[in-house]
């Protein structure tokens, strides 16, 4: 994977995985140790996590598909009634194949996979890629959901969807949720998002995602946006689905026009 180099503190608090092993893993993804970075990628005995060392109260960012928020969402969430499920076109027995081209921490993708969709993940930031990979590997071992996730949720070893071939790597739906500069009020709501945005920043080239997404999608491209954000590429969608704080802009694929 050809990533531009990322400098971040690398720390091991694990009794099983050494700092040398963490450094070697990161080197494969062009991540190097930078002791001056306020961000740290930390290997604990349980997981890989991201911390903002100068703001410890923000807590750690990590991927957990088994417990916490995702367990609650799986058991008590809306399932097929969730906004993201409706946006990608889940209806009756129709379960579209999905490429989530801006996977982030994988939460929307997990919801779709738990419903039964085959979902492939693309994540271009190398640190987020490692967090996702770690979370998936742990979830694959879970007795309750491991087998389902091994069948339905896979992380692709590519950096950008323009590396995928529309003739062979297509899907029914391509899902885009590019990072967008948050209004200060909303940025303070989720502490985790502040850590994440410090690492990733806004997707300033998010407009470059729409064309390759349209080429890969047989049925539709779904773009999740804050309700105050402009359309991706300034391109009017065929229609939108609105929620309390977001909207899903939906562009029908060539076969559906």
Curated annotation (Swiss-Prot):
S-adenosyl-L-methionine binds at residues 107-108, 123-124, 177. It catalyses: guanosine(1516) in 16S rRNA + S-adenosyl-L-methionine = N(2)-methylguanosine(1516) in 16S rRNA + S-adenosyl-L-homocysteine + H(+). Its EC number is 2.1.1.242. It holds the Pfam family SAM_MT. It is found in: Cytoplasm. GO terms for molecular function: rRNA (guanine-N2-)-methyltransferase activity. SUPFAM superfamilies: S-adenosyl-L-methionine-dependent methyltransferases. It is an enzyme of class 2 (transferase). One of its GO terms (cellular component) is cytoplasm. It comes from the Bacteria. Keywords: Cytoplasm, Methyltransferase, rRNA processing, S-adenosyl-L-methionine, Transferase. Belongs to the methyltransferase superfamily. RsmJ family. Specifically methylates the guanosine in position 1516 of 16S rRNA. This is Ribosomal RNA small subunit methyltransferase J. It comes from Haemophilus influenzae (strain 86-028NP). The gene is rsmJ.
């Amino acid at each position: 994977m050809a990533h531009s180099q990322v400098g971040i503190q690398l720390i091991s608090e694990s009794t099983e995985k050494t700092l040398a092993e963490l450094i070697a893993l990161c080197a494969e993804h062009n991540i190097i140790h930078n002791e001056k970075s306020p961000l740290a990628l930390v290997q604990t005995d349980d997981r890989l996590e991201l911390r903002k060392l100068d703001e410890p109260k923000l807590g750690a960012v990590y991927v957990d598909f088994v417990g916490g928020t995702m367990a609650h969402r799986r058991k008590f969430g809306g399932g097929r009634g969730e906004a993201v499920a409706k946006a990608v076109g889940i209806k009756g027995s129709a379960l579209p194949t999905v490429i989530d081209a801006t996977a982030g921490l994988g939460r929307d993708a997990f919801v779709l996979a738990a419903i039964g969709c085959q979902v492939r993940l693309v994540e271009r930031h190398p640190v987020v890629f490692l967090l996702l990979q770690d979370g998936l590997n742990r979830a694959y071992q879970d007795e309750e959901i491991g087998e389902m996730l091994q069948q339905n949720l896979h992380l692709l070893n590519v950096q950008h969807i323009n590396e995928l071939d529309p003739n062979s790597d297509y899907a029914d739906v391509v899902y885009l949720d590019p990072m967008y500069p948050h209004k200060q009020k909303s940025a303070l709501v989720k502490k985790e998002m502040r850590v994440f945005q410090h690492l990733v920043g806004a997707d300033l080239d998010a407009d470059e995602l729409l064309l390759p997404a349209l080429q890969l999608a047989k049925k539709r491209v779904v773009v999740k946006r804050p309700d105050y954000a402009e359309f991706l590429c300034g391109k009017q969608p065929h229609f939108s689905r609105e929620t309390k704080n977001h909207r899903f802009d939906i562009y029908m694929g060539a076969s559906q026009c």
